[in-house]
A protein has these predicted regions:
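A short, surface-exposed loop/turn module that caps and links secondary-structure elements
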Residues: 33-60
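Enriched for short, Lys/Arg-rich terminal
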Residues: 1-3, 9-25, 29, 50, ...
Length: 90
């Protein structure tokens, strides 16, 4: 099981998600899978990122609700970097 670390930017992004009344249960399901080191279903479109987020991964909680994260296996940590819409993040 991975320990979760949230960046300060993720915490700001999260406040926007809550204000938008997004379905938090969908996020909790994805988070649970990641914490327990289980692979995500294809519907989440989990993939590696390049550019500014090189070394990170992105998954789609909903078609326009993304989660950017990375896993540090050596210290068993899941770091949540950003969450929001495509226009919020890119």
């Amino acid at each position: 099981m991975l320990k979760v670390k949230m960046t300060s930017q993720f915490k700001k992004d999260w406040k926007k998600i809550v204000k938008r009344n997004c379905d938090i249960k969908k996020f909790e399901k994805v988070l649970s899978l990641l914490i327990n080191e289980q692979s995500l279903d294809e519907k989440y479109k989990d993939h590696k990122l390049i550019g500014d987020y090189n070394g990170c991964r992105e998954c789609h909680i909903e078609p326009d609700w993304l989660l950017i994260y990375y896993i540090e296996n050596d210290i068993l940590t899941l770091t949540l970097l950003r969450t929001g819409t495509h226009s919020d993040l890119f």
